[in-house]
């Protein structure tokens, strides 16, 4: 039985030597500054979450870890009993709240958080879909997509590469209560090379996955995903970032 069942991904935590450069990129990407200190940058989406991306200032650029929302404050005390876990502690950062810090099998930090400050949602104008059929038929209305980035709504999922996929997935399921949505294997079912996992929120519908672990020779962050209002935003913002000529395209549309 899992120690607790987290409800959702809260944020990704990174380190970088230049907070100005990070803020510029993340703003181009569609995030909005929630807070900034001399040593850290906190970026938000349009949903009420105080922040969904944290960058700590450091000499080296690297991935620190992921944070997840606890289902209750009592769950912090429960997960603090996990091997190697910190005590329940106050978060001395913008947004406040409490947390427990853990290390997953590849050494990355996992935070379980509760009681963070919520912000007012940022209003975003939505263009209704044009189906050619009432009531969604936009007769006589010209559609123009904005040239600036579409504001990101929320953080979606995080993906880790790991040499030991089964061990990593077992830790997340036993500790945070994830449920397997789809597993990928080669040959035998015990030769697991990828695993999509979702939060266990009972009868409440959740995303297909909040965590994906994929086999890789070295452990590391593969990507973090963010939700935008519609597919137009995915393609349009991909072109917007490409036109800036400042960033390296990684893979597909949107990365």
Region locations from a protein language model:
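Core segments of cupin and vicinal oxygen chelate
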Residues: 4-50, 160-208
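Residue-level detector of conserved, well-ordered beta-strand and adjacent loop positions
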Residues: 44, 56, 103, 198, ...
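Short, structured motif recognition centered on aromatic/hydrophobic residues
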Residues: 8-12, 26, 31, 43, ...
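Intrinsically disordered, low-complexity, positively biased terminal segments
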Residues: 2, 19, 51, 59, ...
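Vicinal oxygen chelate
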Residues: 7, 15-20, 38, 67-151, 195-196, 244-255, ...
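Short, charged/polar, Gly/Pro-enriched secondary-structure boundary elements
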Residues: 48-53, 107-111, 118-120, 202-208
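N-terminal beta-strand motif that seeds the catalytic metal site of vicinal oxygen chelate
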Residues: 1-20, 65-66, 124-166, 179, ...
């Amino acid at each position: 039985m899992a120690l607790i069942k987290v409800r959702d991904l809260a944020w990704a935590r990174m380190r970088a030597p230049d907070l100005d450069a990070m803020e510029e990129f993340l703003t181009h990407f569609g995030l909005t500054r929630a807070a900034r200190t001399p040593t850290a940058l906190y970026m938000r989406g349009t949903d009420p979450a105080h922040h969904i991306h944290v960058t700590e200032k450091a000499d080296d650029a690297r991935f620190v870890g992921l944070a997840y929302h606890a289902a209750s404050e009592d769950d912090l005390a429960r997960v603090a009993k996990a091997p190697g876990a910190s005590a329940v502690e106050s978060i001395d950062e913008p947004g406040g709240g409490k947390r427990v810090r853990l290390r997953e099998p590849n050494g990355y930090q996992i935070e379980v958080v509760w009681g963070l400050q919520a912000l007012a949602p940022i209003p975003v104008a939505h263009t209704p879909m044009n189906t050619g059929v009432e009531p969604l038929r936009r007769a006589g209305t010209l559609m123009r997509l904005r040239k600036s980035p579409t504001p990101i709504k929320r953080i979606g999922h995080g993906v880790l590469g790991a040499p030991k996929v089964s061990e990593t997935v077992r830790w997340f399921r036993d500790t945070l209560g994830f449920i397997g949505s789809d597993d990928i294997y080669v040959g035998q079912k015990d030769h697991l090379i990828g695993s999509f996992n979702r939060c266990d929120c009972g009868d409440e519908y959740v995303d297909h996955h909040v965590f994906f672990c994929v086999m890789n020779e070295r452990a590391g962050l593969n990507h973090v995903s963010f939700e935008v209002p519609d597919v137009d935003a995915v393609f349009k913002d991909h072109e917007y970032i490409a036109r800036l000529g400042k960033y390296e395209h990684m893979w597909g549309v949107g990365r």
